[in-house]
UniProtKB/Swiss-Prot annotation:
Any one GO molecular function term: gap junction channel activity
Record-level GO cellular component terms: gap junction; plasma membrane
Keyword Transmembrane helix: yes
GO biological process: positive regulation of gap junction assembly; positive regulation of nematode pharyngeal pumping
The protein's name in its UniProt record: Neurexin like receptor 1
Signal peptide extent: 1-20
Cytoplasmic side: 1130-1180
Gene that produces this protein: nlr-1
Length: 1180
């Protein structure tokens, strides 16, 4: 007991010595020099809102970037709060520097305030020169543990061993570095050592940290704070027992440790195992000052080279290059002629090529020299033999007289491969270089550790500071994150052109988590009707048991086993099934010869059963309740002999049904038996069928203050969100995902009807905006993706991308909608199929839980059939509605406002040339009159002979005549209505390729078959003639509405016309026409037939007329102004739009093609002779 207490005291002492006293210090600059080597545990920055990266130096001003476990640089966010926002870290440093994370960050004139929590670290940096020491485990406080943590901070240029422990009972823990890669060998007593390795080019003489972390069933290896590898221990044991004596910086000399380095040469600043500082326990004579001379080096960038004069052999250097095929070393003569080339091929293998004899040799062994690690190169010539060594192995050689010629003529060595070079025998600081070269340091940035390529993509370092991903089929993008595969069958059917394919069923590859780690799944998508007659999309997952399984002979219960293979993992099964509201699977069990299902033998136990995806036994069949030992027939009491299953009756029978319990599905295995030589069973399992993907349920937001929210942490390399949404407002917030302090966020919103994706981080903002508007009330598919190199936005397949460098924020809380949130305008519309970084957001389930007012499940807006009248379209705003009356002759908020005019006899109303954009096949007019034998409208084509007339005959009946301009005349009459009965009648007529129809008051009165395509060419309209007297409204010519928008429709009129609603009940017709304007005003009205028409609504309530005296006075006051402006208005408003051509030469237009010229016959003032319009202008 006393011994255990001593061990605990020593352990506590070692921990206290390691940690030391901690305190907070602050610096008003971006650089903070500490008082010696300290352990930094917390960081915070105070100042204007910005973002900073962190670099630390242990010694020699060698600064390294601090990174997170996922490989991203650590980002410190400064705040204006007086309370520090701490970021927890754990590293050693003598100096800490921060610098803006953004290249063009806003400069803070005051400078940021850097706050650190530092702890005393009294252990000196120890230098090892092929020397080592031992530590007694009990003296260091090391005990057997189920969780272990080994941390080593080191720098070296060579391979070596850090820690060595091999216990007598077989437990092993060895940490070493070999060719720049850290290797850890461990065993917890199973006598089967496991290995884990990570890192690359760590023998570069810079400070690095390796951390081996064991947590019972998990082992991780991190390099410089980045998790690079992880595995699971083998065997049954999980506790690590150390040898009584552990070795630091070496190992004992024995014959059992082959493949393990014997010593270590370099420096170690920290070596801790389970918080025991083993470096502090080193002997005093080992504490040498860390002095590591830095060899001369330089970095060759693309298209650069270095020329090294030949002085002596061997010619030796170390290199770390980018995997680009081309020459590594070229031997030149004095005339710059190539003697020998050492080149790198596409597989990063070396070849030797002689320019003299054209001899080519491949390296043997074939060493990958472009893997990003440091390699040694040595060229030597001995007599008639030239040898090239890579990493100490002779891989290339050349023999014969050719070697003599090379040695005699050799003048220069040319290095041209892009990468880093260093040498202790060659002065690389003074070599002649061509191109972009960085001297004195290696600027090679490892971009493929950890692998940034997702979904099985391979990373290749393409430049000193860049990489490319070789993506697998179906994925693309910088990091192989982007995929065009649908998330579900519902999404696939929604895609244009797939609805018809789904009727028969189609094999589809779906990716549930989008660009996430989960692999795609092959399913069958089919549109079919369920048992209650509702059409829906079914997702069908097939297995490999295509035919029924037959079992016979003597078999014990469950003796015959068969595993059903679906081609997916258990994780994929869980994600697939759990995402649906309902899944089912057909099951059939046929028994013959007395075989039983649930009551076998004296124990009356099941003879056959199945296994679920969670490896549980399913002890029921068909629709029977889970684990009930019943079959489907027991539910309705139809089993034979009142048993629980038909196959428990002892007779030949069948139990079948559809298993509807998702927790039991799919059936992954069959355990069959209970048969004899005279009995048999036959089992059939159908495919898994699922319906109603929960995330595809639409959710309607009818209150812009409503919201749905949830928590999800984002700390990945790539952000993405995909959803389906429809809306009608031009300004809205769809989805936001923000940090806890609301200073950093992703925001997807609508601005001016366009989709906008915005990333805000550290006071910097990046936006991407769609090209088109989408506030049309229709579903649109949106996908937005962002990473450190840029982002792109895809709406309905139309993609827009932005290339820029920025940092993705760390966010936690997502919100859909909510006007009350900061910077949010709320959401009103329908949203579904939301996937946020591979996670399905089933908003319908959130809506059920939160019961938020203004949020409802389903696609149900405000619009109802009776809200908009007279053919107006209801535009659903989801928090309200508006009526679109633009395609009707009506107006007002509900399309009930009439636009009409009282037309006295002698008036003229016409459209001299209709805008071509308004021409169509359907037209409309409403009249109220007592006139007979009058024309309702006349129409013709400017450049054709076709005509159309509609009149009221002597009996008040409707009569129409048409001529197609070539052969056929049409004439019809309808006697069903008396159009002269002083009642408003609504007349509409439409033509098509094969029919012409006329309707009066909604009743079809005339139908003519034939070719009526000529009807679309009518572009000259005359309404009513001089005999007509009454009220007219609802005029529609194609897509134009002359009474509603006279300027747009190019309406001209003349006469004593009064505009207002029709019919006008406030005054009689006599009162409406009984006014005597000034003669000048009358002539002005006639002359300015194309002046602006202003339409006023006349109230239906009766009002007293304004006295004629007051009206006359007003008219006299305005007459002078009207006379002055009439000529200018006439000129500007009377000419139709277009281009006029003169017909004087007859080259452009033929006057005979028009029935009526645009300029009517006039009389010359000089000779009173008529001047014909055919000699003037025609519109072409």
């Amino acid at each position: 007991m006393s011994g255990l207490c001593l061990v605990l005291l020593l352990s506590i002492f070692a921990v206290s010595q390691s940690s030391g006293e901690c305190s907070d210090v602050s610096f008003s600059s971006v650089a903070s020099k500490l008082d010696g080597l300290k352990r930094v545990t917390r960081l915070s920055v105070s100042g204007h809102i910005s973002a900073y990266h962190v670099k630390v130096s242990i010694s020699d001003d060698d600064f390294q970037l601090v990174r997170l476990s996922n490989g991203n640089p650590l980002v410190l966010y400064s705040t204006l709060s007086n309370t520090p926002s701490w970021t927890h870290v754990d590293f050693l440093a003598t100096e800490v520097r921060i610098f803006p994370a953004f290249e063009q960050a806003t400069e803070d004139v005051r400078g940021p305030l850097l706050i650190l929590t530092i702890c005393d670290y009294d252990t000196p940096i120890t230098a090892f020169d092929d020397s080592s020491y031992t530590v007694e485990a009990h003296h260091a406080g090391l005990v057997s543990m189920y969780e272990n943590d080994l941390c080593v901070v080191f720098r070296t240029y060579r391979s070596g061993v850090f820690f060595f422990s091999m216990a007598d009972q077989g437990d092993v823990l060895i940490a070493q570095i070999i060719h720049g890669t850290v290797h850890v060998i461990f065993d917890f007593g199973s006598l089967t050592p496991s290995r884990i390795s990570a890192g690359k080019a760590l023998d570069d003489g810079r400070w690095h940290e390796m951390r081996w972390l064991h947590q019972f069933d998990s082992v991780q290896l991190s390099i410089d704070g980045v998790l690079l590898n992880q595995t699971a221990p083998t065997g049954l044991y999980r506790k690590l027992d150390l040898h009584s004596v552990v070795h630091i910086g070496g190992r004992p000399n024995d014959d059992f440790s082959q493949g393990i380095e014997t010593t270590f040469t370099g420096c170690i600043a920290r070596l801790q195992l389970n918080n025991a500082d083993l470096l502090q326990l080193s002997p005093n004579e080992v504490h040498n000052q860390c002095q590591m001379p830095k060899p001369p080096s330089f970095t060759l960038h693309n298209s650069s080279r270095a020329v090294l004069p030949f002085t002596f052999l061997p010619f030796s250097f170390e290199f770390r290059i980018v995997p680009i095929n081309g020459p590594l070393v070229t031997l030149f003569d004095a005339e710059n002629g190539t003697l020998v080339d050492v080149v790198i091929d596409e597989e990063s293998k070396l070849h030797l090529v002689s320019n003299i004899t054209k001899f080519k040799q491949a390296a043997n062994p074939a060493i990958d020299v472009a893997d990003g690690a440091w390699h040694s190169f040595s060229l030597r010539i001995r007599g008639v033999r030239m040898e090239i060594d890579i990493d100490g192995y002779t891989v290339l050689w050349l023999e014969g007289h050719e070697v003599r010629r090379v040695s005699q003529r050799l003048s220069n060595f040319i290095l041209s491969a892009s990468g880093c070079y260093r040498s202790v025998t060659i002065d690389l600081t003074s070599v002649r270089v061509d191109g972009n070269v960085t001297r004195g340091e290696c600027t090679f940035q490892e971009k493929c550790l950890p692998n940034p390529c997702e979904n099985g993509g391979g990373c290749v370092q393409s430049a000193l500071d860049d990489y490319v991903c070789n993506c697998k089929e179906g994925y693309k993008g910088k990091n192989c994150h982007t995929t065009d595969l649908p998330h579900s069958c519902e999404e696939w059917v929604f895609t244009k052109g797939n609805k018809q394919k789904a009727v028969q069923g189609r094999k589809v590859l779906i990716d549930i988590d989008g660009g996430g780690e989960m692999q795609p799944i092959n399913v069958t998508c089919k549109t079919e009707r369920d048992e209650i007659g509702i059409d829906g999309v079914s997702t069908i997952l097939e297995h490999d048991l295509l035919r029924p399984m037959i079992v016979t002979g003597d078999n014990k219960p469950g003796a015959v086993r068969y595993s059903l293979t679906y081609g997916i993992s258990t994780e994929q099964m869980d994600r697939l099934v759990e995402g649906f509201e309902a899944c089912s699977q057909f099951m059939r069990y046929t028994c013959r010869g007395g075989a039983r299902l649930m009551t076998q033998g004296d124990e009356r136990s099941p003879s056959s059963w199945y296994s679920t995806r969670s490896d549980k036994h399913g002890l029921q069949w068909g629709e029977a309740p889970p684990y009930s030992r019943m079959c489907s027939c027991a539910i309705n009491g139809s089993c034979l002999h009142n048993r629980m299953c038909n196959c428990d009756s002892g007779e030949d029978s069948t139990d079948e049904g559809v298993n509807p319990y998702s927790q039991l599905l799919p059936v992954t295995g069959l355990f069959l038996g209970g048969t004899t030589k005279s009995s048999s069973i036959e089992v059939e399992i159908g495919p898994l069928k699922c319906r109603n993907r929960a995330t595809f349920d639409p959710v309607t937001f009818s209150n812009r203050n409503a919201k749905l929210s949830g928590a999800q942490t984002f700390n990945q390399r790539t952000f993405d969100v995909s959803l389906h949404v429809k809306f009608s407002h031009s300004q809205m917030s769809i989805l936001s995902w923000h940090s806890t302090d609301d200073l950093h966020w992703f925001h997807l919103y609508v601005n001016d009807g366009k989709i906008v994706g915005e990333v805000v981080n550290g006071g910097e903002s990046q936006q991407i905006v769609s090209e088109h508007r989408y506030d049309d009330g229709k579903f649109h598919a949106i996908y937005w993706e962002a990473d450190s190199t840029g982002m792109f936005l895809k709406v309905d397949g139309q993609r827009k991308s932005v290339k820029t460098s920025f940092i993705l924020p760390t966010v936690y809380m997502w919100i859909v909608g909510s006007r009350t949130e900061k910077g949010s305008t709320g959401f009103a519309g329908v949203i579904r199929n939301v996937h946020l970084c591979g996670v399905e957001l089933a908003l319908g389930q959130y809506a059920r839980k939160e019961t938020e007012r203004g949020v409802a499940i389903g696609d149900d807006g405000y619009c109802r059939p009776d809200l908009c009248q007279n053919g107006g379209q209801c535009v659903d705003k989801y928090d309200g509605y508006v009526c679109d009356c633009s395609m009707t002759p009506f107006g007002g908020s509900d399309c009930t406002k009439e636009y009409g005019m009282m037309v006295p006899a002698g008036s003229s109303i016409q459209i001299p040339w209709q805008n071509p954009a308004h021409q169509a096949m359907c037209h409309r007019i409403a009249i109220q009159t007592t006139s007979r034998n009058t024309t309702i409208l006349r129409s013709k084509a400017l450049f054709a002979d076709s005509t159309f007339n509609m009149t009221v005959d002597d009996n008040g009946n409707l009569q129409m005549m048409a001529y197609d301009g070539f052969f056929f005349h049409f004439k019809r009459q309808s006697k069903r209505h008396n159009l002269s009965d002083d009642i408003m009648h609504d007349i509409s007529f439409c033509a098509s390729k094969h029919h012409f129809n006329v309707s009066v008051d909604g009743m079809q009165v005339i139908t003519i078959e034939g070719n009526w395509t000529f009807f679309e060419s009518f572009n000259v309209w005359h309404f009513l003639d001089e005999n007509f007297e009454g009220c007219v409204s609802r005029i529609q010519t194609g897509s134009a509405f002359p009474l509603k928008n006279p300027k747009t429709a190019r309406l001209n009129y003349s006469g004593k016309i009064r505009f207002g609603t029709c019919p006008i009940e406030a005054v009689s017709r006599q009162q409406m026409y009984d006014f005597n304007p000034q003669p000048d005003l009358i002539s002005s009205t006639i002359k300015t037939s194309t002046e602006d028409i202003k339409i006023f609504s006349v109230s239906q309530n009766k009002q007293d007329l304004v006295s004629k005296a007051i009206i006359g006075g007003g008219i006299l006051a305005l007459s002078l102004f009207i006379l002055c402006m009439s000529s200018l208005i006439c000129y500007m408003r009377s000419r139709p739009e277009g281009v006029y051509k003169t017909n004087e030469t007859g080259e452009n237009c033929s006057p005979s093609r028009s029935e009526e010229p645009l300029v009517h016959n006039t009389t010359s003032n000089n000779n009173n002779n008529p001047t014909y319009a055919s000699n003037k202008e025609y519109f072409c």
